[in-house]
């Protein structure tokens, strides 16, 4: 483990581990957009995915154009800071998985050996994340959309108080 490692992904099944890598990236880069995600993990990492893109907006999943090739459950959907809901492609062959694991290291994301998911109908794998070296996800400060209005009201209140005390405070 390197000192620059931020997150370790433990996964059950190869594709769930890849999903965990993407979720870890989103934690590390909370202001990231879909375009940033596509730049960080380009389509060239996963050429055999059977879809056009590694990541799509979740409302696009399940269309004839992309079949059922994306994670679609609510807990699998990636929610970006800009409000975008992103679905991640499901198919990750061994070579593609090895490429995304190598790429993830550039962002301080390491993968523990994944374990096989339980076999059988309705069984699916999962992932969990462990923060390393004292790292915690950055807290995104919410932008105050009406800050100027609050500032204006405060200035008006101060002006009214000064006026009141100057003319009626005697």
Predicted regions and their residues:
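Intrinsically disordered, charged low-complexity linkers and terminal tails
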Residues: 1-170
């Amino acid at each position: 483990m390197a000192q620059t490692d931020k997150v370790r992904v433990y996964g059950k099944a190869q594709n769930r581990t890849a999903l965990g890598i993407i979720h870890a990236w989103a934690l590390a880069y909370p202001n990231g957009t879909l375009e940033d995600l596509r730049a960080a993990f380009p389509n060239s990492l996963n050429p055999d995915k059977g879809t056009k893109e590694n990541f799509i907006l979740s409302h696009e999943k399940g269309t004839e154009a992309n079949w059922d090739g994306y994670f679609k459950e609510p807990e699998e959907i990636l929610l970006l800071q800009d409000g975008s809901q992103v679905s991640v492609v499901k198919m990750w062959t061994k070579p593609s998985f090895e490429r995304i694991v190598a790429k993830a290291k550039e962002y301080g994301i390491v993968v523990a050996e994944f374990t096989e998911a339980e076999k059988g109908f309705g069984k699916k794998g999962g992932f969990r994340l462990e923060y390393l070296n004292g790292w915690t996800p950055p807290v995104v400060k919410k932008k105050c959309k009406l800050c100027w209005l609050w500032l204006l009201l405060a200035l008006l209140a101060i002006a009214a108080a000064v006026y009141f005390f100057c003319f009626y405070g005697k």
